């Protein structure tokens, strides 16, 4: 196999990669020594990935020496455990070292197996690589792309156009797709829900700080759902719906957006509506949770077991049957006529 830098992984390193992919290790530190990729540190998992993150990674980062770190998450995809690939390139390292490690990154990912790598993190200072830095990276990834100068000018024009008092009948521009950051505790709760260690997560918007925060993770049955819906505030709910359908036992993730009508302020209604799509984008495309059904309600009383079942498994509408042509009155049909085809008529005449 040829590479840009000629750096390759030895057979020992490839064997270690295989053991790591099978879940034996939480962390591998990789360095380039004598023009070969080598494993210079490894750690086995002892607790959750969040609890071990900073204590395992940060002590391995040297001030003047680049390295790679493969860090294993607790989540899995179709190929196995998911990993974070970290490229550490400190500001004070030699330029030649920086270039060498930058040019070898693609090789490392390919040798390890790109399908196992969920996220890539690059850092020049430890704050970039810390757990807090990782969450900042995820928040940035889920935020909208920066606006061009023309788009920013257009945005300012629209803001000025809509800076008017909003009355009952006033038409106004609504906010579109606001991606508020998700706090750490909320993100962790969603991961636990995906792994089915929780069956209910409720999130709310901290309007003052403009963040999405955790509100509740109480273990919840279907019959308890109406009690979880506030009557005076909006919420986002994620529920692991365990049920049977056509003889199969199913686990389905359901998203419920509750908005109790006009008991909420205009700003609250606008923010919850605008943050919903970016939040679901993070859930479905970052956490890879498949949402079976998205429901909007204004009253928790709607969430009966039958309602939830029919939302997740909507009834198929039967095709309309054509009305049969009505028969004529009995005894008044007249003489039955026999209509012959052309061939039959000729035979009869012969």
From Swiss-Prot:
It comes from Xenopus tropicalis (Western clawed frog). This is Twinfilin-1. One of its GO terms (cellular component) is cytoskeleton. InterPro entries: ADF-H, ADF-H/Gelsolin-like_dom_sf, Twinfilin. The lineage of its organism: Eukaryota, Metazoa, Chordata, Craniata, Vertebrata. Residues 4-139, 177-313 form the ADF-H domain. Belongs to the actin-binding proteins ADF family. Twinfilin subfamily. Actin-binding protein involved in motile and morphological processes. Inhibits actin polymerization, likely by sequestering G-actin. Residues 316-350 are annotated as: Disordered. Its main location: cytoplasm.
């Amino acid at each position: 196999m040829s590479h840009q830098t000629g750096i390759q992984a030895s057979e020992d390193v490839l064997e270690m990669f295989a053991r790591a992919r099978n879940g034996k290790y939480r962390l591998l530190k990789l360095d380039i020594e004598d023009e070969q990729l080598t494993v210079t540190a490894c750690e086995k998992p002892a607790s959750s990935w969040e609890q071990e993150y900073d204590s395992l990674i940060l002590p391995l980062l040297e001030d003047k020496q680049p390295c790679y770190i493969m860090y294993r998450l607790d989540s899995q995809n179709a190929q196995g455990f998911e990993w974070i690939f970290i490229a550490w390139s400190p500001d004070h390292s030699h330029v030649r070292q920086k270039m060498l490690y930058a040019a070898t990154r693609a090789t490392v990912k390919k040798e390890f197996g790109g399908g196992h790598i969920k996220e890539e993190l690059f850092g020049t200072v430890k704050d970039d690589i810390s757990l807090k830095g990782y969450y900042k990276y995820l928040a940035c990834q889920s935020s909208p792309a920066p606006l061009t100068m023309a788009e920013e000018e257009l945005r300012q024009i629209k803001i000025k156009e809509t800076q008017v008092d909003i009355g009952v009948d006033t038409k106004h521009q609504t906010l579109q797709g606001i991606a508020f950051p998700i706090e750490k505790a909320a993100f962790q709760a969603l991961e636990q829900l995906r792994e089915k260690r929780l069956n209910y997560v409720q999130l709310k918007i901290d309007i003052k700080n403009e963040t999405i925060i955790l509100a509740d993770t109480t273990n919840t049955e279907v019959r308890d759902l109406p009690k979880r819906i506030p009557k005076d505030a909006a919420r986002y709910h994620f529920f692991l719906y365990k049920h049977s359908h056509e003889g199969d036992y199913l686990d389905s993730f359901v998203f419920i957006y509750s908005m109790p009508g006009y008991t909420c302020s205009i700003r609250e209604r606008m923010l919850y509506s605008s943050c919903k799509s970016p939040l679901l984008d993070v859930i479905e495309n970052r956490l890879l949770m498949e949402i079976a059904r998205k429901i909007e309600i204004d009253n928790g009383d709607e969430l009966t077991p039958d309602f939830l079942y029919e939302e997740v498994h909507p009834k198929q509408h039967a095709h309309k049957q054509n009305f049969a042509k009505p028969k004529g009155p009995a005894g008044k049909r007249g003489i039955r006529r026999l209509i012959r085809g052309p061939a039959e008529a000729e035979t009869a005449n012969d």
